[in-house]
Amino acid sequence: ALHSKECLRLWEESGFTTHVPSAHIIAAHVHHALHEDEDAARHLAQARRIGTETEIPIGIWLSYLTEAYFHIERNDEASAIPALGRGLQIGRETGLFGTFLWLPDMLEKVAARALEDGIEAEYVRELIRRNQLAPDPTNPYPAEWPWPVKVYTLGRFELHGDDRSIEFGRKVQQKPLSLIKALVAIGGKGVSEGRFAELLWPDADGDMAHHSFTSALSRLRKLLGKDEALELKEGRLSLSNRHCWVDVWAFERFLGQAEKARKEGKEKEAIRFFEKALSLYRGPFLPFEEMTWAVPLREKLRSGFLGAVAHLGRHHEKVGRWEEAVSCYRKGLEMDDVAEELYRSLMVCHIRLGQETEALSVYRRCRKTLSSVLGMNPSAETRSIAASIGRSPA
């Protein structure tokens, strides 16, 4: 606090008013760190006033972004939105993309918040690119971030580079694609070359397997156009979380955050994270990949998805929002039409709404789907719910 006060005094005495707003912003950060919110707000107001009087927009820009950052740090994100919107508007209109006052994690956090809410999105993406910002470590996988590489594996397989789909036609060799699929399937971090040899080149000897691995890795890097996206250290391959976004990583993180909030009794927060997770799940992991190494993660993610749908559905049921529960279970069945537990829950909701015909229709669909896909009949529990409708299922 003493150093920031001395810094401000020296700039004021120097007569170089262009730097005085930045000195006030530094002082505001010091007071914020000391939980002296009124003093922090006073310095931000001074920075804004001087910036306006001297017609130096960078001081105004930083004061608004700093105000938004303080609100985000206090978990008062709703209050951050007005300041964030005004600051980013000023930055866009005046062409501000850099600052000599570099404040750790501030730009990262306000940029992530802005992208999530769709505030000045194009300007924010350019701000991120020019400053080579990495996502906030507490929220490391925002899909809206302009990642150099994005990997989509849920319900599809797509690679994106700089927000554009990477096209790979019939001429593209499959081993580089298999390499990144397998890398994601077995964790994406620190996977040994030997493990890839076992999965992708099981019949090759040591030298041939090594040559195949290095060749596939080289082709994959060329396809992605970002060498740094794939890190090879001491024979272990990783996807860089500074350069790559993977839908599976984001999905699992949201599920983890939801479970943590649920265990802490923060139901509203848990629901928000479950909804974020479900928005990412477009279907099974690598649905057209037949290799056995894809199965464990596929089943794990499916279980997480069904658990999230069930939790959201029960939440709606608990507060009597039966129509919302119906919508939730239907969306779940769109992604996984052999999830018998979702059919049961959907039947119960229709019964509670007095929609017996719809409940019976759901049962018939369940019976037909389970028979044709899995070669099995509905469980006794499911048949019991159908029988409770008052009519024998046809």
Regions flagged by a language model, labelled:
Residues H3-C7, A23, A40-A47, S63, ...:
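Tetratricopeptide repeat
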Residues T17, S79, E93-I119, F168-L177, ...:
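Intrinsically disordered, charged and Pro/Gly-enriched terminal/linker segments
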Residues L199:
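Residues within the alpha-helical elements of helix-turn-helix
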